Amino acid sequence: MNIQSLINDKVSQALEAAGAPAGSPAAVRQSAKAQFGDYQANGVMGVAKRLGTNPREFAQKVLDVLDLDGIASKTEIAGPGFINIFLSEEFLAKQAEAALADERLGVAKEEQQNIVADYSAPNVAKEMHVGHLRSTIIGDAVVRTLEFLGHNVTRANHIGDWGTQFGMLIANLERIQKEKGEVSMELSDLEGFYRESKKLYDEDEEFAVTARGYVVKLQSGDEFCAEMWKKLVDVTMVQNQRNYDRLNVSLTRDNVMGESMYNSMLAPIVADLQKQGLAVESEGAQVVFLDEYKNKDGEPMGVIVQKRDGGFLYTTTDIACAKYRYEELNADRVLYFIDSRQHQHLMQAWTIVRKAGYVPESVSLEHHAFGMMLGKDGRPFKTRAGGTVRLADLLDEAEERATKLIEEKNKDLSAEEKAKIATTVAMAAVKYSDLSKHRTTDYIFDWDNMLAFEGNTAPYMQYAYTRVASIFSKAGLSMDELTGEVKITDEKEKALVAKLMQFEEAVQAVASEGQPHLMCAYLFELAGQFSSFYEACPILNNEDDAVKQSRLKLAALTAKTIKQGLELLGIETLERM
């Protein structure tokens, strides 16, 4: 149950009954401090101002008609007109029982929408690098959350599998096949293959002529070129899949919807834009001038959709892409997890899409932009030599560092168990370090902080789960076979249950805002509340069996909530660390 939403509805009804205009926002929020209750209604002051009345007097009118029977034990007016709401122990205990009995932990499914999520999007014939990490793991966490809430989600891996560079790549692939008859080993180093192809193109005119010819042939459907192109795509995606699997990312080859997929749509779209009077000729190119965007001279900005040589641009592909996602995938929402530097480009493409009538305003097109991963020097994260860090190398180093850490802390574990723990902790650390940061900001990549067992980190959260689970293993009990009822008799118990009951609010916030850091923050706060509860409230050695059973239930619900929350982030838990 979303308690915040429930109270918000109740306060909204009371506002209207007290004389507020229909639809006035109740603005119910989680209270920042326990002294202000569990929730706070902040909408009274804004309504009172519009009505020209005293906020505290109006707040009292609202309280007089506010029906929170069976939900709140106390309500009070604070400051200039805030309403503080304290949940009752009986209500919280009842909600905790219901959540523990539900495999979804009380989280209701939402009305299903068709949602397309565009994320990861590496380029063909290039290895994934750290710049692909944020889109890949942020997108995947949001997708998992949306599916948990019951939505039909289409994963769209918009790989860069088209363009003039494929001429030189195909020409080089052909050269290698003729010389060695074997391709797979040469392509194991995709970056090297790409650099070699570019060097040949720049230095060997005969090779360059062949390469340019292959661009034309590929675009016209030549069988040999198509076969070579497919080989490049296949080899790239096999390598990418290794990274996805290591990171526990849910993308597969079936989710690939590359740039090439929209090729047949581009010419008809330009023709339609011309027919609608949106695209006009300018210096031989087809251009859409947008009043919404101005150039440095204050004139409408021109967006090229077809070059003078007949070639198309990324904007044209993005227009086709949005059109396809609405018309063929029946999208209600389309989420783009793309670097913040692409914002204007996307906005211009979507403006054209709306003007042309390809996607109605009822369909939400959302740019979930993200900042950059920076090194400790505050500059883009690079190798010591100043090069781009390969994602596979980053994951290898994470495993090496985690292995050393686990060796130091768990000398008595078997080699197999140490390896399993190290791999799980390493991948979790890389992901959580990123996911716990606000999506839109740049962040400093710091190995020491990532792998720390203190603070808002993956090792801390994984250990928090293990710690709770160990209560049951020590006692030889199953979390699913507990008896008795939840009874709240201590302030620490109440604080823990109140935080547990905010899980649905965190899930829904991630889904609506595309911000996984909200789940990380929630789980970290929950782990902190459990620590306070565990220190103050004896469980296994409690002499009162009813209290013991109740507290075991709270521990079980905590473990299940942490596990489910981390699962939505794509992070595995461990029963033993």
Curated annotation (Swiss-Prot):
User: Mind telling me which InterPro entries this protein's record contains?
Assistant: aa-tRNA-synth_I_CS, Arg-tRNA-ligase, Arg-tRNA-synth_N, Arg-tRNA-synth_N_sf, ArgRS_core, DALR_anticod-bd, Rossmann-like_a/b/a_fold, tRNAsynth_Ia_anticodon-bd
Per the record, the GO terms for biological process are: arginyl-tRNA aminoacylation
Q: Name one GO molecular function term.
A: arginine-tRNA ligase activity
Question: GO CC terms for this protein?
Answer: cytoplasm
Q: What class of enzyme is it?
A: ligase
**Database matches in SUPFAM superfamilies:** Anticodon-binding domain of a subclass of class I aminoacyl-tRNA synthetases, Arginyl-tRNA synthetase (ArgRS), N-terminal 'additional' domain, Nucleotidylyl transferase
In terms of Gene3D superfamilies, this protein maps to:
Arginyl tRNA synthetase N-terminal domain, HUPs, Isoleucyl-tRNA Synthetase, Domain 1
Q: Assign the protein's first listed, main location to one coarse class.
A: cytoplasm
Cellular compartments annotated: Cytoplasm
| Chemical reaction(s) catalysed | tRNA(Arg) + L-arginine + ATP = L-arginyl-tRNA(Arg) + AMP + diphosphate
**Cell membrane found in the keyword field:** no
Alphabetic keyword roster: Aminoacyl-tRNA synthetase, ATP-binding, Cytoplasm, Ligase, Nucleotide-binding, Protein biosynthesis
Q: What Enzyme Commission number(s) appear in the record? A: 6.1.1.19
| Motif 'HIGH' region in this chain | 122-132
Query: Quick check: keyword Oxidoreductase in the entry?
Result: no
Which proteins does it associate with, and in what oligomeric form?
A: Monomer.
Give the protein family: Belongs to the class-I aminoacyl-tRNA synthetase family.
Question: Which PANTHER family does the entry mention?
Answer: ARGININE--TRNA LIGASE, CYTOPLASMIC, ARGINYL-TRNA SYNTHETASE
Question: What protein name is recorded for this chain?
Answer: Arginine--tRNA ligase
